[in-house]
């Protein structure tokens, strides 16, 4: 039973790591104004990441016109990854 939990936790952490990379790409691309968010692959990227990022918009107001709310998203995702990793190691 322990092996199945280990596999489950490691798979979930792998998914979260991939999602974290997608978030990083999405946030990095917002610095390029010529990105067409309605063309592929950018449309798919925004559809995958925007629901998560929208949870944090409005919590922190933009500073000097820069939206820093994705930082909260990164921090929360890292905390979840750490918690899941610790649970997986202890089981």
Swiss-Prot record:
GO BP annotation list: chloroplast fission; nucleoid organization
Keywords linked to the UniProt accession: Chloroplast, Plastid
Pfam families found in the cross-reference section: YGGT
Any Gene Ontology CC annotation: chloroplast
Disulfide bonds: none
Keyword Chloroplast set for record: yes
InterPro entries for this protein: CCB3/YggT
Compartments, as annotated in UniProt: Plastid, Chloroplast
Signal peptide start-end: none
PANTHER family according to UniProt: PROTEIN COFACTOR ASSEMBLY OF COMPLEX C SUBUNIT B CCB3, CHLOROPLASTIC-RELATED (PTHR33219:SF14), YLMG HOMOLOG PROTEIN 2, CHLOROPLASTIC (PTHR33219)
Family in the record: Belongs to the ycf19 family.
Protein name: Uncharacterized protein ycf19
Source species: Guillardia theta (Cryptophyte)
Lineage: Eukaryota, Cryptophyceae, Pyrenomonadales, Geminigeraceae, Guillardia
């Amino acid at each position: 039973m322990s092996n199945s939990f280990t596999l489950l936790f490691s798979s979930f952490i792998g998914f979260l790591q991939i999602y974290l990379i997608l978030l990083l790409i999405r946030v990095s691309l917002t610095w390029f104004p010529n990105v067409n968010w309605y063309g592929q692959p950018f449309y798919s990227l925004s559809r995958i990441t925007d629901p998560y990022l929208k949870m944090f918009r409005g919590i922190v107001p933009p500073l000097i016109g820069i939206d820093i709310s994705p930082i909260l998203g990164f921090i929360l995702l890292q905390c979840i990854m750490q918690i899941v990793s610790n649970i997986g190691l202890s089981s």
